[in-house]
Amino acid sequence: MAGLVKAKDYDWKDSNMELFGSSKDRQVKKESAMTEKCWEPVGRATSPFLMVWRVNQFTLEPVPSDEIGNFYNGDSYVICKATRSPGGDKLLYNVHFWIGKHSTADEYGTAAYKTVELDTFLDDAAVQHREVEGYESQLFKSYFDKLVILKVILKGGYASGFRHVKPDEYRPRLLRFCKEGKTTYMRQVAFSKQSVHSGDVFILDLGSRAYQFNGSKCSAFEKSSAAAFLQDLESKRNGRCNTSVLDEADTPQDVGVLHEFWTALPDVPVKELEPPKEVIKSLYKLSDSSGKLELTIVSEGSASKHDIKPDDVYIILTKEGLFVYIGKDCSVLEKRNALSNAHKFLQTCPNPFLPITVVTDEQAESFLKGIWDE
């Protein structure tokens, strides 16, 4: 088919996931999983790893190792992280799908479907997660020393990167470096003077010239991350890019404003991000005991482990994210519809972009620790 047309911001959140959960769906997933070439290295692995795939028109393609940690907001991705079990040789798997701000509903659906397919390939041993740009879970961010979020560079969202573009044809961009916990974010921000402030480090990339601006209140980690990026930029452009550093603290204001870092940026308004809305912790039950699948509220304001029964699926809404508990004795219908119902549930919530984590009874002990109100 022709290149996908990008939807407006986060239109994918209204997408339909009705295919999930049917008996045909499970059969198709299993058959597809056994023939998906992307899963072959996962099946062969005997030691911990981090693998990433990008959705390209309903299929996946591996992200090269030197690009892992770079995410384009016009795309969706599948991420598999394997760690060694404590005191054992068994591998533990976390499978995430990440949705860029400008990803289409088709790309989102493919990423979600492939995440469940990979879990099927691993005999349901993985913990499944949904991640949305700008709302990533702490677990997801912990995988990367540097997490890079870039805007779409070429029409259609399947970004090319600078190495395929002449320096003078490259679209100017403004990059922000910000440390959150142990991870340094590099995020492409609005191309405006009003995006720049003293608390972080910024790089103005003009193609043949690039400038690092160190805010007077930035951290040493942000400085070093930006410097490393700038050095890598020079290397990748084979000396075709001149770089320099502008320190706000050491530069007189009347001199600084004449620097190209400032003169090249337009002074246009920047849309402020809406602060997250208040989330009331709540517990819901997904059950087919009545003959049809129904989601009902169990409690609001708290979530007690004592309300959990092994023969149903439960959804726990918290400010950190949405957790889905798969009871060990739940029905096949309840289990297969857990992720799709979590997605539908969040569509009605004030914060529809919260991370989603789906855990089995066996996985719940570690992932739901600290969630319960006893």
From Swiss-Prot:
Its lineage reads: Eukaryota, Metazoa, Spiralia, Lophotrochozoa, Platyhelminthes
Report if keyword Heme is assigned: no
Keyword Metal-binding set for record: no
The family database entries (PANTHER family) matched by this protein are listed as: SEVERIN, VILLIN
Function as written in the Swiss-Prot or TrEMBL entry: Severin blocks the ends of F-actin and causes the fragmentation and depolymerization of actin filaments. This severin binds stably with actin both in a Ca(2+) dependent and a Ca(2+) independent manner.
Listed under GO biological process in this entry are: actin filament capping; actin polymerization or depolymerization
Q: Which family does it belong to?
A: Belongs to the villin/gelsolin family.
Organism name: Echinococcus granulosus (Hydatid tapeworm)
Extra remark: Severin changes its conformation upon binding of Ca(2+) and then interacts with F-actin.
Q: Which CDD domains match?
A: gelsolin_S1_like, gelsolin_S2_like, gelsolin_S3_like
Q: Where are the Gelsolin-like repeats?
A: 58-109, 180-220, 278-369
* InterPro entries (UniProt xref): ADF-H/Gelsolin-like_dom_sf (IPR029006), Gelsolin-like_dom (IPR007123), Villin/Gelsolin (IPR007122)
Q: Which domain of life is it from?
A: Eukaryota
What GO terms fall under cellular component here? actin cytoskeleton; cytoplasm
Q: Name one GO molecular function term.
A: actin filament binding
Could you identify this protein by its name?
Severin
Keyword vocabulary terms for this entry:
Actin capping, Actin-binding, Calcium, Repeat
